[in-house]
């Protein structure tokens, strides 16, 4: 059983482990990084009729209500205290049996639900892959938008990057989120027949902080056991690779302000462990490109990811 850590302790560890993510998010509040409107605009919580509660309970100590906003042509959730999983299922005639849990990013303070969640899931479903967007629990933030921006500035102030070249273990700070991911894998396996999913072909792809959760689930998720993983503009810090580590797909832009100049220790770790790894370093794309239409080759990550999981035999039809 994964143990929930206290919110105060979780915040303290996150300040250290996620400093680059937090800094970039805070900077994005002042500097437009995309052509879309960078202003945060509060919106009503969208209807999510297909969302399934994961049963991991409310986040301990969290009292702020869940709130959503628009920014950069996408929608974002904050103060998520109850984790959910939303299925995006392919036409049964096209179903391959493969499934992917999609973990949006946002520095563990927000979730980019559209650009790094729903849009990814819809594209996967169109390829015959059952996709499931996980809305995992987040670090509490002030409901008020101005107070939220101020809290982020305080959050990353003075935080340092981890030493380069040394294995990083941020999993201790992510116990609630790892529990959410484990519950997502368990739910899909329980309902595999209903959803036309092969229980042995369930993978996970994550973006930025969601990539961090994907890696943490791979390393510390115990019974989660993803069949394959995608790390999309996530940290490439070296890790201790399990002997049974799944095939790894990585996509990153060389001009990513967070991780573009931090080395490729994760790739080296996987190769040293003699586990399958594929790495796409795009010349341009920045951070957070997701499914946004851009003039850079980084938009090709999705097609490459689908070809890669097909190469690994994940898209063979069940029948």
Predicted regions and their residues:
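Bacterial N-terminal signal peptides that target proteins for export
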Residues: 7-21
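N-terminal signal peptide c-region/cleavage motif recognized by signal peptidases
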Residues: 30-31
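Serine-hydrolase catalytic machinery in alpha/beta-hydrolase-like enzymes
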Residues: 51, 58-84, 91-100, 105-195, ...
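Alpha/beta-hydrolase
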Residues: 103, 232, 282-285
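Primarily recognizes the serine-hydrolase "nucleophile elbow" in alpha/beta-hydrolase
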Residues: 175-245
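Short beta-strand/loop motif that positions the catalytic acidic residue
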Residues: 250-252
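C-terminal catalytic histidine-bearing segment of alpha/beta-hydrolase fold enzymes
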Residues: 276-319
